[in-house]
Structures are given as structure tokens and as C-alpha cells.
Amino acid sequence: MDFVKEFATFLYEKKIIRFGDFTLASGTKSPYYIDLRLIPSFPHEYRKMIKELQNFIAEDIGFENFHSLVSVPTGGLIVAASLATEIVKPLIYVRKQAKEHGTAKSVEGVICRDMKLLMIEDVITSGGSVINAIKSIKEKKNGCHRCICNS
């Protein structure tokens, strides 16, 4: 069985994808819900997913075409942190809001001018969190090269 079919079956069997009436973070109503934050509870499948993303990036984007991964908490960050470790690339993450304590930053990680960044997100409905993250990064004089979403 190829990875996509095997992974979809796993998501269904472990109730990571559920069917019913759901209201998503964007406010959109959906007949299904995917909670990829549960995948690290299944380390073998989690590693397969990370490896599959690594292969996709190698073949379709090329590791030489970006400097760092960027993501948003929480779902995307879970994936991006493991992926960054596997491909040995830095990781930046963007909070929805700046912290009210410590350094009061919304963007964490080292960003240099003109870095090419690859956005990793777990599930996208309206794209709002990705758009807001890109705006925060652009304020730091950087752009996002490409966005990858698992769903």
C-alpha cells in the first residue's frame, strides 16, 4: 500500500480524522476534523510522516532553495520541529500574539535579511494563521518562499 493510503487509513483508525459537525479555528463549519497534534503519540507513523515530508521537500523543492523552516504553534510547530532536526535546518516560529513577558517577541528564532523561508503548517482552512505569520516575518524584512501543509 502506498504511503498516502496507508497514512489515511491510520488517521481514520486512530480517530485523528473524525467526521461530524465541527467549527474550525477560522469559524468555518466542516463535516470533518483532522487533529495532527495527536500523531506524535504514535511514534512510528509520526516518523514515517516526517520522512515522507523530507522526501517531498528534497524532490519537489530542494534543500538548497531555502535557509530555514518557519511555522506556527501548535500543530505546524510539532511537525516543523521534527522536520528541521531531520533535514538539519534552522527553525523559526511565529506566535499569534507577541508575548507579554520576557522579550515580548512574536517571532522566535534567528532571521537574517533576505533569508528564504519554507512555511510548514499542519492543516489550513482559511490560511489566516499562515498569512499572519508571513506578515510578521515581512515586518522583519523577510519573505516566505513556499508553504507546505499536511492536509
Where on the chain are the PLM-derived regions?
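PRPP-associated nucleotide enzymes
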Residues: 1-151
